[in-house]
Amino acid sequence: MRVDFNCDIYLTGSNAYLLSSELSTYLSGRYVEVKMLPLSFSEFVDFCGVEFASGGSVALAPGGEPVLFDEMFARYLKYGGMPAIASLSTTQAQHSAYMSGVYEAIAVRDIVNRERGKGKSAVTDPSLLRHVAEFLADNIGNEYSPNGIAGALTSTGSKTTNKTVSSYVGALEEAFLFYRATRYDLHGKALLKTNPKEYIVDTGFR
């Protein structure tokens, strides 16, 4: 029986659950994880068919019309780097519809339904999940605490606890929608006393 196949096998997934499940124990030491992110600004420019000269501030779009570097960067910050809508012709309506669909897929399929499938009840409220995501997206680069988020949400009528908020933030991180940044210059107990920051995976979600 042949046991050495000259082939590569690729498994793709939209969240961290695949490698945190029982499957990872069978693949231990036998796989390479490659995390795919939305387009960087330079990749976004390439996708749009625009090429700026080194240090140049103006280029020509595929249709021949001039494009300013600053306008291109502002467009990237506004619409983000999702390949499906990386185009100079993308409208605000198209962007909103697409990003809303992507978020719903992440929130419902990758988070809520997965939690239910695992028999857990930590993340069950899509509305609360959206509120937590909106809070984090609106406070990019700012320190936060689960207590602070829980207090803010409770004061607006969405009663919750810091433990629930922690579960929801963790679920958003597992779905690769947010990435946590902690202090690199602190160690030991001092690190435990600081609050982290969250950064969203794509500015288009904001």
Task: Tell where the protein language model's regions lie, with residue ranges.
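Residues immediately C-terminal
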Residues: 3, 18, 205-206
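A structure-centric signal for secondary-structure junctions around beta-strands
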Residues: 6, 70-73, 194-195
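Interdomain motor-coupling "hinge/lid" segment immediately C-terminal to the ATP-binding subdomain
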Residues: 14-16, 21-142
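Accessory nucleic acid-recognition modules appended to NTPase machines
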Residues: 87, 92-206
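Short glycine- and Lys/Arg-enriched binding-loop motifs that mark or flank ligand-binding interfaces
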Residues: 9, 25, 76-77, 198-200
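Structural signal for conserved beta-strand scaffold positions within catalytic alpha/beta enzyme cores
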Residues: 11, 33-35, 180, 200
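Conserved catalytic/switch belt of AAA+ P-loop NTPases
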Residues: 1-11, 24-25
